[in-house]
């Protein structure tokens, strides 16, 4: 699912709201999560999961095309840890529908 599909699904489930208002709400939520992560804060959505920022130290990588060594700078990256309810729900759906890979 992509963001526009999420917006469409939410707008369909809430016909009393205008599509543009649903889009504005989704964008505001995502902007809030992004801003909090940019400040180094942790964002927890109980039952769904938690977003945080992790430090990746500098390392030596390889260019896959040429095989030459390349210095990769240290950086901070977003990290998501799933919540217990989300893990259990996904696992249950896989057990009841084994053709999902």
Curated annotation (Swiss-Prot):
Q: Name one GO biological process term.
A: regulation of translation
Q: Please provide one cellular component term from the Gene Ontology annotations of this protein.
A: chromosome
**SMART domains per the record?**
BHL (SM00411)
Q: Which GO terms describe its molecular function?
A: DNA binding; structural constituent of chromatin
Report if keyword DNA-binding is assigned: yes
Q: Which InterPro entries match?
A: Hist_DNA-bd (IPR000119), Histone-like_DNA-bd_CS (IPR020816), IHF-like_DNA-bd_dom_sf (IPR010992), IHF_beta (IPR005685)
Please name the PROSITE patterns in this protein's record.
Answer: HISTONE_LIKE
Keywords from the named record? DNA recombination, DNA-binding, Transcription, Transcription regulation, Translation regulation
Function, as annotated, reads: This protein is one of the two subunits of integration host factor, a specific DNA-binding protein that functions in genetic recombination as well as in transcriptional and translational control.
The family database entries (NCBIfam families) matched by this protein are listed as: hip, PRK00199.1
Which protein family is it in?
Belongs to the bacterial histone-like protein family.
Q: How does it assemble?
A: Heterodimer of an alpha and a beta chain.
Q: Which HAMAP family match?
A: IHF_beta (MF_00381)
Name the chain's protein: Integration host factor subunit beta
Write the gene name.
ihfB
């Amino acid at each position: 699912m992509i963001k526009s599909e999420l917006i469409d699904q939410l707008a369909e489930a809430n016909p009393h709201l205008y599509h543009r208002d649903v889009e504005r709400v989704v964008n505001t939520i995502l902007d809030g999560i992004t801003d909090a992560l940019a400040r180094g804060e942790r964002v927890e959505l109980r039952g769904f999961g938690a977003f945080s920022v992790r430090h990746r130290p500098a390392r030596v990588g390889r260019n896959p095309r040429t095989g030459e060594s390349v210095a990769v700078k240290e950086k901070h990256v977003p990290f998501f840890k799933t919540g217990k309810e989300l893990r259990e729900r996904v696992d249950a759906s896989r057990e009841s529908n084994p053709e999902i890979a």
